[in-house]
Amino acid sequence: MQQSQSRSLVDWLSYLEQIHPANIDMGLERVGTVARRMGLTELPFKVITVAGTNGKGSSCAMAASILMAAGYRVGVYSSPHLLRFTERVRVNGQELDDGDHCAAFTEVEAARGDIALTFFEFATLAGLWLFRRAAPDVLLLEVGLGGGSMPPMWWSPTSP
């Protein structure tokens, strides 16, 4: 992508839909390689992975409310979004702005090199980059369909 820093969020999202031939491509190798390049292998906060067939969003919302009431700064990564892409990354209930997401996409794009990332992989890496900058005490990381083979699982304590 040319002039990636001057792209709007809409432009970035359109681009992300085109850079991988499949919507879903199971495996953690691509995410792991780019995460290492971005320095995202060791996150400076606790990560709670939320997985399961149903209720992940509700579980994240409830856990976030409890943790915030206890005085913690809480990040929540969820997918898919309902209305706006920025819903996927929230800190203490607040979405980050389009410019923050564009900056994160620029970082992922620079780190990925010739690795073709799916939309979800790219978005997850961008989200983790944003959370590292936002410095929550705890991150609730929702895992999508596919469970252990999905990008957020790379940061699970049982992953590589």
Give, region by region, the residue ranges found by the protein language model.
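ATP-dependent carboxylate-amine ligase
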Residues: 1-7
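ATP-dependent carboxylate-amine ligase catalytic core
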Residues: 7-11, 22-24, 28-43, 69-157
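A conserved segment at the C-terminal end of the G1
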Residues: 46-50, 58-75
